[in-house]
């Protein structure tokens, strides 16, 4: 969940109070930061010694740097920092507009790993279940940051929009990385949906229900390439009547990203990213 953007709302309200005859600024606004300066990373020392291994593996995989590299193609007007931190025992992640940070908690990563271990998964499925949710959550919270910093208008729940942003971004990075990350993220939502007893708070929450998020991820993936993502229907139980409309859902989401966010993408930074990774960008799975 993103922190409320009170300061942004206040600035917009104040701007409406300025007199129409106010003189124009004599200096042009400062240019946005260069790609390398747009998104920084911080690995904070974990408070719990049991999380030390998570820190070492994340650093070794350059986990935050890989995500920052992708977000860096967006010409954000202010720097953004991705932080891996301890959160007083709480498994969470959030965007803080006042500090310009996206925080991912060690406790959250530990929870993903515990869920995967308890399911006794093997091979790629085990790696995806442990790593996919972490990547997806970080991109989801970064979506809140992009919406805030670019002043992206949102029709509907911002949490749904952040899920869509993360999913479309992954799909545009490449089918392979998207398959593994989205499979892991959806698996996590499916596991939580299976064990949670729903109450009034779940239905009133800003976030969609875990089961809804599970199907939404697979629907967008399937809609982007029904042949490649056929397992969404064949193995992961996306209902056929929902699957029939997923192509349209994906293109609707892609159109929104192209209209609202793509104009802020730095084409040179994007090309450097493509050349560097040769279309096989890997999020450290």
Model-predicted regions and their roles:
Residues 157-196:
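Post-HExxH zinc-binding segment in Zn-dependent metallohydrolases
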Residues 22-24:
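Bacterial signal peptide processing site
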Residues 115-136, 150-154:
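Short pre-active-site segment immediately N-terminal to the catalytic Zn-binding motif
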Residues 200-285:
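Pan-zinc metallopeptidase signature
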Residues 84-103, 108-117:
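Catalytic zinc-binding patch centered on the HExxH motif and its immediate surroundings
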